[in-house]
Design a protein with these regions (language model features):
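Internal, Lys/Arg-enriched amphipathic helical interaction segments that engage polyanionic partners
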Residues: 1-42
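Short amphipathic alpha-helical segments
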Residues: 38, 42, 68-72, 125, ...
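Acidic-basic catalytic patches of nuclease active cores, encompassing PD-(D/E)XK
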Residues: 42-91
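Pyridoxal 5′-phosphate
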Residues: 91-92, 101-102
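Short acidic loop-to-helix transition motifs that present clustered carboxylates
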Residues: 95-99, 122
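Active-site beta-strand-loop-beta-strand hairpin of nuclease catalytic cores
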Residues: 103-114
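Catalytic cores of nucleic-acid endonucleases
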Residues: 119-172
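Domain-level recognition of nuclease-like catalytic cores that cleave nucleotide substrates
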Residues: 152-200
């Protein structure tokens, strides 16, 4: 295999997954009837799943310290695939002119959700990440997207998030800051780079 894991690493990964699956409630992963290419509820459900799964991963520093962007992405994909019997989540999937980190499609092959994963390297890199997402992966029909940023160093995290939000507001395609979804999750709308009337 391209990458091997120790028994301790596998144990940690299984524990994270089990904690997420067994912690039933409003974030029960199955939502096969609620997700569609136009559903805000389905979009919120995906974002909540990613947020809560990531929040649980924060407890296992020995595991995530070894992850690069691809490692984080691969860790989330099985969980995203468990959310619906009628949708498929894939990684490094070609869309438009490049390979996006996470692509969820329905059974007809219609894109439902696109996400790009990045390690935090300063707020100046956020604009490049948005450019990459909008210019390379998002077609005119794609509306539900996310930029997932992983930060291994939690020092001055509140200040970091404030700077990140302000930086995103400066992006040329910025349309509106909708607000904070959760402690470290923020929602924006952007204009499509090829059509300013198309909002993403």
């Amino acid at each position: 295999p391209a990458k091997t894991y120790s028994a301790d690493e596998m144990s940690l990964e299984i524990e994270v997954a089990l904690n997420s699956y067994l912690n039933k409630g409003q974030y029960d992963p199955v939502f096969e009837d609620k997700i569609s290419s136009l559903s805000d509820e389905g979009y919120d459900n995906i974002l909540n799943q990613i947020y809560n799964y990531g929040q649980n991963l924060e407890k296992y520093k020995n595991l995530y310290d070894k992850f690069d962007e691809e490692g984080f992405r691969d860790f989330f994909l099985p969980h995203l695939n468990s959310m619906s019997k009628n949708h498929t989540a894939t990684g490094e999937t070609f869309n438009k002119i490049g390979k996006t980190d996470i692509l969820i499609q329905d059974e007809k092959g219609i894109n439902v959700f696109i996400a790009e994963c990045k390690l935090w390297k300063g707020e100046s890199e956020l604009s490049k990440a948005i450019d990459q997402l909008l210019d390379r992966y998002v077609t005119w029909r794609d509306e539900k997207v996310a930029l997932i940023v992983f930060n291994k160093d939690m020092k001055k995290f509140t200040e970091l998030m404030t700077k990140a939000v302000e930086k995103l507001k400066e992006h040329p395609q910025f349309d509106k800051y909708i607000g904070k979804r959760k402690d470290s999750s923020y929602q924006f709308t952007f204009k499509h780079p090829d059509d300013s009337e198309k909002i993403i």
